[in-house]
Amino acid sequence: MAFDIHGFIKELLEKRKVFHNERDFQIVFCCELLKKGYTVRPEFYFDEKDEENKENSRRKYLDLVALIDDECIAFEFKYKTAELEENIGGEKYKLFEQGARDEGVYAVLSDVCRLERVIKNNTEFFDKKITKGYVVFLTNDGGYEKGFTRKG
């Protein structure tokens, strides 16, 4: 059975709706995968080879790689926040306005490109090729829903 990323995230967000930062979200995501019995490796390092320009070859990492139902899946995470100061379930959250939405979108697109290269280059984890990748973008900033225009 294929991994249902939407169902997994929905289930995770029912347990916890707010995170202090991107690392907090990554840890909770990783723990939920572990609870389900999956093998996970946060900050999975790999050698990215550039066949056209060998000097561009370098060591890179993915936020998370998991072995899920015999399928190797890579994950990249982005958590972009608007200002929020609230007590939720007895826990105080203070999120800062990150702004620069254009840079946030660029970072997401860079992650998509990295995942595409990882899959194309047959990167392996536990002797299995990474065959699927997800960029998980989480935000409380409604500005990301409005889209972008270029002025000038």
Per-segment meaning from a language model:
Residues 1-35:
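Interdomain/boundary linker segments immediately adjacent to catalytic/signaling cores
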Residues 20, 24, 28, 59, ...:
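Short, well-structured alpha-helical interface segments that form or flank functional binding sites
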Residues 37, 70-71, 130-132:
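A general structural motif
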Residues 41, 73, 133-136:
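A structural signal for isolated positions on well-ordered beta-strands in alpha/beta enzyme cores
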Residues 62-77, 82-84:
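Active-site beta-strand-loop-beta-strand hairpin of nuclease catalytic cores
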Residues 79-146, 151:
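Catalytic cores of nucleic-acid endonucleases
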